[in-house]
């Protein structure tokens, strides 16, 4: 495993099909920690599956790392890294401090499990883009694909997303709400059910994705931003994941457009 004492909490910029050159902010770092344990996660099998919020990395270190980073080369600053960013209790504080340094847009990639918590929603509302994962239309599929922490249900996730959207409207925020769907063999035939949820939520945008990075057998911090040639630096064996064909992806996109009339972007278009 990489010596963490020499690793920055800020990495990149890396190329992202969704947002361009993205500078990553890792609020967790020391171990992979998430309220999901997705079967396709680029971090591999999550070491700490939890819903408990805490301080992982001090705000001071993160801001110091940010100032030393190549942030001026980035198009956007993205909170992702070694797990679920909303688990970090200093998420909101870090966002505020970074906004004092730069006006570059800030994105948060989240699985939505903690959005039911008002404090968490307050933490994320100053972001410019909140991208929420939604791969499953029911609890059975949620457990198959996302393997959530105990107590997490699809109902609680959907309710949290709706509350977030309501907060954005009530506070007159310009925050963009995106729903990201990772299509896998387990959910590719559930388009109608997912479309129904999307019509309930009415996000500003839907991002269709399929795994583009392999699933490592173990965790190494390099996996938080590994793309292309970088995946060869991972010290653990990696397992390629089955993805959708271009034809399947086009059919899914066309069907979702037909059923939702929402703004849709797709990894296959980039």
Indicate residue ranges for each PLM-predicted region.
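Short glycine-enriched, charge-decorated loop/helix-capping segments at active-site entrances
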Residues: 51-54, 144-151, 222-223, 238-242
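Short, well-ordered alpha-helix to beta-strand connector turns
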Residues: 38, 74, 127-128
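Auxiliary Fe-S-binding modules of radical SAM enzymes
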Residues: 2-18, 29, 64, 187-270
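Conserved AdoMet/S-adenosylmethionine-binding subsite of the radical SAM
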Residues: 86-222
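Conserved alpha-helical substructure of the radical SAM core
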Residues: 44-79, 93
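Glycine/small-residue-rich loop that forms an oxyanion/phosphate-binding "nest" at active or ligand-binding sites
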Residues: 73-74, 79-81, 98, 106-107
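Canonical Radical SAM [4Fe-4S] cluster-binding loop centered on the CxxxCxxC motif
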Residues: 4, 17-57
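Short glycine-centered, acidic/aromatic-flanked micro-motifs in structured strand/loop junctions
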Residues: 27, 79-81, 181-183
């Amino acid at each position: 495993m990489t010596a963490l004492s020499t690793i920055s909490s800020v990495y990149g910029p890396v190329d992202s099909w969704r947002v361009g050159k993205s500078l990553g902010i890792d609020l967790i770092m020391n171990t992979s920690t998430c309220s999901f344990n997705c079967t396709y996660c680029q971090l591999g099998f999550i070491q700490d599956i939890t819903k408990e919020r805490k301080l992982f990395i001090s705000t001071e270190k993160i801001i110091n790392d940010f100032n030393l980073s190549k942030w001026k080369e980035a198009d956007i600053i993205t909170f992702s890294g070694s797990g679920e960013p909303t688990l970090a209790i200093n998420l909101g504080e870090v966002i505020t401090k970074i906004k004092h340094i730069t006006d570059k847009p800030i994105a948060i990639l989240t699985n939505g499990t903690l959005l039911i918590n008002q404090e968490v929603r307050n933490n994320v509302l100053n972001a410019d883009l909140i991208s929420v994962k939604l791969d499953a239309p029911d609890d059975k599929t949620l457990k198959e694909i996302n393997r959530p922490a105990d107590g997490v249900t699809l109902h609680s996730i959907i309710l949290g997303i709706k509350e977030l959207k309501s907060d954005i409207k009530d506070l007159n925020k310009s925050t963009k709400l995106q729903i990201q769907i990772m299509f896998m063999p387990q959910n590719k035939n559930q388009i109608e059910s997912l479309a129904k949820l999307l019509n309930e939520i009415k996000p500003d945008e839907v991002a269709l994705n399929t795994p583009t990075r392999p699933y490592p057998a173990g965790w190494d911090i390099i996996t938080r931003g590994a793309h292309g040639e970088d995946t060869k630096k991972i010290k653990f064996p990696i397992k390629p994941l089955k993805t959708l064909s271009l034809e399947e992806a086009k059919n899914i996109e066309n069907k979702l457009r037909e059923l939702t009339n929402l703004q849709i972007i797709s990894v296959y278009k980039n």
